[in-house]
């Protein structure tokens, strides 16, 4: 068994990735909507954008069929906030995932590890959440 590198093991981020993928697909069918991503992390975080922001931007860009801008903010002690914004002339849709504690990453890694028991192959967090999978809680 092998788990391909994941930018983020939070179960919430894995769900968020699927939600923004569907939103991007729907907004791609409409005219007049732009998208961008804003991420905020603690001041000591070295990479900008983060791996999670890069993965989410790739998801949204893939759904829209065009690249999106990413804004990175490093301040305070924020564990991680990712906001995808679909912006139209008369309305705006904001989708947000906010990690309130770094334990979510460890918990997600444990869920993924339990899910991997007895499996062979290369997997991602999307596989852990696939419709035919049982995610341990």
Predicted regions located by residue number:
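C-terminal substrate-binding/catalytic lobe of Rossmann-fold NAD(P)-dependent oxidoreductases
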Residues: 31-137
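Short, small-residue-biased leader/transition segments that mark boundaries at the very start
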Residues: 1-2
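Active-site PLP-lysine loop of aminotransferase-like
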Residues: 9
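Rossmann-like NAD(P)H-binding beta-loop-alpha module
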Residues: 15-32, 48
């Amino acid at each position: 068994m092998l788990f391909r590198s994941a930018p983020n093991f939070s179960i919430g981020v894995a769900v968020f990735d699927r939600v923004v993928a569907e939103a991007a697909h729907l907004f791609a069918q409409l005219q007049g909507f732009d998208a961008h991503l804003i991420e905020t992390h603690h001041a000591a975080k070295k990479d900008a954008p983060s791996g999670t922001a890069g993965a989410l931007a790739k998801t949204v860009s893939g759904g829209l069929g065009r690249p999106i801008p990413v804004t990175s903010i490093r301040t305070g002690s924020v564990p991680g906030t990712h906001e995808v914004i679909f912006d139209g002339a008369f309305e705006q849709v904001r989708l947000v995932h906010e990690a309130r504690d770094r334990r979510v990453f460890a918990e997600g890694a444990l869920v993924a590890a339990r899910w991997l028991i007895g499996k062979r192959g290369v997997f991602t967090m999307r596989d852990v959440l696939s419709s035919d999978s049982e995610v341990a809680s």
